[in-house]
Each structure stands twice: as C-alpha cells, then as structure tokens.
Swiss-Prot record:
This is Vesicle transport protein GOT1A. Belongs to the GOT1 family. It is found in: Golgi apparatus membrane. GO terms for biological process: endoplasmic reticulum to Golgi vesicle-mediated transport; protein transport; retrograde transport, endosome to Golgi. Residues 31, 90-100 are lumenal. GO terms for cellular component: cytosol; endoplasmic reticulum; Golgi cis cisterna; Golgi membrane; membrane; nuclear envelope; trans-Golgi network. It is a multi-pass membrane protein. The gene is GOLT1A. Its main location: Golgi. The lineage of its organism: Eukaryota, Metazoa, Chordata, Craniata, Vertebrata.
C-alpha cells in the first residue's frame, strides 16, 4: 500500500480548497479575489502533494513550457484583476499541460463506471492514445 505523509494530506486539502475557490469564483461572475486565492491554493497544494522539485520539473520541461507560460501567465493576469482573460489563458495552459493525462483518466473512469452509457462514453473519449 502507498504511504501518504502528513504534508501530502495537507496538500490534498489545500488543492481541494483551491479548486473550490476557483469554481466558486467562476460561478460568481469571475470574482478576481476568489479566483486569485483559488489559484494560489491550487499551486501550493500541488507542490505539497508531489514536492517542490517534482513540481518544478513537471512545469518546466522543454515540451511543456508553452502550457506552463500560459498557466502561470493566466495566474498573473488574474492577480492583476483581469479575471476573464486570465481564466482563458489558464484554461488553455491547463489543457496543454495535462493533455497526456486525459486519455488515462477517461480510461479509468470508463472501467470504474458501471452505468452503461457513461462507461461507453468514457471509453470512447479515451481513444487510442494511452500512456500505459
């Protein structure tokens, strides 16, 4: 079994709060304070979960620099109180950074989900490009 440290548990909680504040800020018509707070919590929680060195390594790989620049640029734009533009940049950066993870996640959801329609939908979204 995988052992999880106390710092990783705290990181999961902080990341969850970050996602909550980002979604809540989006629901409140792109409230810049909530979005900025959510961004900071999300990035802090991510670094607590996987560690500072691995976080730096993930974001600054040569083939991920474009996505990283859009994501971090979006965070800066949100902090400068331009939330709509910042969230568009962040969304593009997020999909650019995590595009290799989506087929794996959809494949997992397709296997776990017992509802026939949703299982077939997730398996179709998985496609043929798998990281395994």
């Amino acid at each position: 079994m995988i052992s999880i440290t106390e710092w990783q548990k705290i990181g999961v909680g902080i990341t969850g709060f970050g996602i909550f504040f980002i979604l809540f800020g989006t629901l409140l018509y792109f409230d810049s304070v909530l979005l900025a707070f959510g961004n900071l919590l999300f990035l802090t929680g991510l670094s607590l979960i996987i560690g500072l060195r691995k976080t730096f390594w993930f974001f600054f790989q040569r083939h991920k620099l474009k996505g990283t620049s859009f994501l971090l640029g979006g965070v800066v734009i949100v902090l400068l109180r331009w939330p709509l533009l910042g969230m568009f940049l962040e969304t593009y950066g997020f999909f650019s950074l995590f595009k290799g993870f989506f087929p794996v996640a959809f494949g997992f959801l397709g296997n776990v989900c017992n509802i026939p329609f949703l299982g077939a939908l997730f398996r179709r979204l998985q496609g043929t490009s798998s990281m395994v």
